[in-house]
Amino acid sequence: MSKKDTEHDDDFALFKDAVQGVKKLRQDTIIQQPKKNTKQKEITRSNREASDSEFYFSDEFVPLLNADGPTRYARDDVSTYEVKRLRRGVYVPDVFLDMHGMTQQEAKRELGAMIAYCVKNEIHCACVQHGIGKHILKQKAPLWLAQHPDVMAFHQAPLEFGGDGALLVLLSIPEK
């Protein structure tokens, strides 16, 4: 044996004698929380928000909308000045939803998800592009939007945001 090996053995024996009779401490003060699966919870929460928002849209209920002129709607507590500002394009949409090629069910779900997203991120103006096509979504989108409690007003979009094939939506953001 070399000199290093004997020193190592002596050190190890000395350490073993020093810690003889020592017991492992039991962790009793800090509780380790199990790691949560945050990604899965985020997915389920966003799906729940979308389905909750979709709850407001009924195909049986038909709100009274102005039939002549461009498509427009305003709640009773919204001034006509706000609708005029929507028409003129003063409000610039931060979110665009393109519903071209969607079924009614898909469009309804995406519309609910868009409104939930806007409320969550405090976005006041959005653009819904329903297209012209066979006029199915063009007729349904205003009816669905008029039923949602977070929609203050909507108006046919100016040409730069889609014209006849789009709506500008003004949303109310609840105070936190």
UniProtKB/Swiss-Prot annotation:
Enzyme class: hydrolase
Molecular function as annotated in GO: RNA endonuclease activity; rRNA binding
Keywords, in A-Z order: Endonuclease, Hydrolase, Nuclease, RNA-binding, rRNA-binding
Domain Smr: from-to ranges: 97-172
Source organism superkingdom: Bacteria
InterPro entries referenced in this protein's UniProt entry, alphabetically: Smr_dom (IPR002625), Smr_dom_sf (IPR036063), SmrB-like (IPR022990)
GO biological process terms, semicolon-separated: rescue of stalled ribosome
EC numbers, comma separated: 3.1.-.-
Subunit structure: Associates with collided ribosomes, but not with correctly translating polysomes.
Known function: Acts as a ribosome collision sensor. Detects stalled/collided disomes (pairs of ribosomes where the leading ribosome is stalled and a second ribosome has collided with it) and endonucleolytically cleaves mRNA at the 5' boundary of the stalled ribosome. Stalled/collided disomes form a new interface (primarily via the 30S subunits) that binds SmrB. Cleaved mRNA becomes available for tmRNA ligation, leading to ribosomal subunit dissociation and rescue of stalled ribosomes.
Family, as annotated: Belongs to the SmrB family.
Protein name in the entry: Ribosome rescue factor SmrB
Annotated organism of origin: Vibrio campbellii (strain ATCC BAA-1116)
Gene transcribed to yield this protein: smrB
